[in-house]
Amino acid sequence: MEKLLIKGGKSLSGQIDCSGAKNAALPVIAASILSSDDITLKNLPYLQDITTMFELIGSMGADISLDEKMNFKLNTSNLSNLEARYELVKTMRASILVLGSMVAKYGYAKIALPGGCAIGSRPVNYHLKALEKLGAEISLNNGYIEAKAKKLIGANIEFEGVTVTGTENLMMAASLAEGLTTLTNVAKEPEISDLADFLNSMGAKISGAGTDEIRIEGVEELTGTTFKIPADRIEAGTYLVAAAVTNGKITINKIDPTRMGSIIETLQKAGAEVDSNGNSISLDMTKDAIKPVDIVTAPFPGFPTDMQAQFTVLNCIGSGESSVTETIFENRFMHVQELNRMGTDITINGTTALINGVDSISGAQVMATDLRASASLILAGLIAKGETIVDRIYHIDRGYERIEEKLSNLGAEIIRLPN
């Protein structure tokens, strides 16, 4: 397996461009199944999860091509295999996103129960119960979800728990359902609004995305479209934390700051100077020491669970005590054991990490366990004394585009070691 070798101690400085958002791109690719026309997607990030999603719809019969401007063109009009096989689904939980599109467009879907990051229970039962309310017949057999429907019918659906992918799945399914569907207790993440924008550009009638209630008036068919994937707020947040922990000064371009309110606010509480305009964010941590910040993850617009591992590293080198409480997913502190091997002082108490700040940490060989945990280990390597080797970096390649290249451009000493 490839590894990353990091020599710590360099302050980050300079500018980078933010990549397209994986969490916006994956549902958009899944939603392309709803149209029989050509779909052109711009600003797709080069990530393993994107490749896996293309392999998934390609295995069903989708036609996928890349033009001279590096835009992807998709056509799913001739899907002949309505099964998402375990070999692909096991590597990525977001593969469940094709369920709503397939049953709405083709009346049938067979999808292996999903895999992906090993961070606890992410139940798909919210998706399945909601699809049943639209009239789908759902069965679970031999590790596969099987869904059938002659025609989905609009309904009033209140999710039992807030679910991003569940909200997205139902938005897709309801777009081709007969009549009005109302979704409540929905996720409000920016990527929900992105999916609504994409579907509406295809002719869907969706309103309320980003609010407490989403209304979808079903239509007969959806057309082709051209859509640009928005920038990745989690990638931007990760690089801002990287600059903060290295007492650096950076600017991230091509990012909408309004999507990052809680991240920016938390960085400011930690002592960073953060400025933004309509298309960039600048952070300066050269004038102050890090102040630890208590964090509780929450659905958007609260603090994102996908940033808690990175801010845990920030708190580790702040002066004093702090806590990070995870309310979204189980088992999302698997990076803590590896961080403690580098000299941090973190104790887990249930769903809370109790952190005592330390003066310094030391490089070590560490192992990534999931996507955001791997990001935290890289951040720790940037500030550690000596060399850090991060193993199993296939996790990082699922969600960060060319991370070693971008960090190197900001002054970090980091290289990828071959197998």
What positions do the PLM features span?
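Short, structured segments at the rim of ligand-binding sites
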Residues: 1-419
